[in-house]
Amino acid sequence: MELGIVAKRETPRAVELADRIRRHVDVPVTLDNLTADELDANGTDVTSLSACDLVVSIGGDGTFLFAAREVSPTPVLGVNLGEVGFLNAVSPEECVETVAGVVERMQAGDAELQELPQLQATGPGLSLPAAVNEVAVLGPQRGRDNGLDIDVRVNGEGYSSGRADGVLVSTPTGSTAYNLSEGGPIVHPDVSAFVVTEMCAESSMPSLAVPTDRTITVHVDGADHAVVAADGRTRSQVAPPAEITLAVAADPVRIAGPKLEFFTALDKLD
């Protein structure tokens, strides 16, 4: 078995914990390049850590999302450095023992893994990674007299059409992120649904929860271009008229370690 570690960049506490973990576990450990440089060790790019059996992310949800995108479907264990931490269930004080315990259980073949759905966007000229949090389909810019014409369908049945700044489709994981700021609902992680939320629509429909086995299509027109963004990091332009298809991705995010105390994390949103 091999363990990979990704630590939040420019964060001495994260690097310190990475060093403690690698010295404690009794399996080969590979560090991401930036962490390895801090510890004067050999490292590799984060994508190559997908060859490991388990990857430990040390930081906040952003670090976890970055690691999960790069190494999926390799399981990820998140160590939370005091942020909201909807994805990171392990505290710094418990991380060394927790990682060692998960490694032992994985070696014995009895580790429990939680799987979270990802969202895949496809369409003309699109080349986007699967999204852990959300996919946004946006006009050239937001605001009055901007946006684009949209037609949203679920398995071919019409949900909404009209002028809007865009459409946001969120996973349960992403429901506490961009989706929440756009007025969408929080979705419990045990609920297998995507959330469709229009963004500043002229005739807005309420947000819609859609089973993850359904296909969502967004037809866009009425603008010189549209932008499709996965998790706010990777963007691609499409030329209207065009249709973007959103469906559950082939590979889920797999989380190792203790299960998240969801309602405890919600308290930190205040």
Curated annotation (Swiss-Prot):
It catalyses: NAD(+) + ATP = ADP + NADP(+) + H(+). Keywords: ATP-binding, Cytoplasm, Kinase, NAD, NADP, Nucleotide-binding, Transferase. Belongs to the NAD kinase family. It is an enzyme of class 2 (transferase). NAD(+) binds at residues 61-62, 133-134, 144, 163, 165, 176-181. The active site is at 61 (proton acceptor). Its cofactor is a divalent metal cation. It is found in: Cytoplasm. Involved in the regulation of the intracellular balance of NAD and NADP, and is a key enzyme in the biosynthesis of NADP. Catalyzes specifically the phosphorylation on 2'-hydroxyl of the adenosine moiety of NAD to yield NADP. GO terms for cellular component: cytoplasm. This is NAD kinase. It comes from Natronomonas pharaonis (strain ATCC 35678 / DSM 2160 / CIP 103997 / JCM 8858 / NBRC 14720 / NCIMB 2260 / Gabara) (Halobacterium pharaonis). InterPro entries: ATP-NAD_kinase_N, ATP-NAD_kinase_PpnK-typ_C, NAD/diacylglycerol_kinase_sf, NADK. Its EC number is 2.7.1.23. GO terms for biological process: NAD metabolic process; NADP biosynthetic process. The gene is nadK. GO terms for molecular function: ATP binding; metal ion binding; NAD+ kinase activity. It comes from the Archaea. Gene3D superfamilies: Probable inorganic polyphosphate/atp-NAD kinase, domain 1, Probable inorganic polyphosphate/atp-NAD kinase, domain 2.
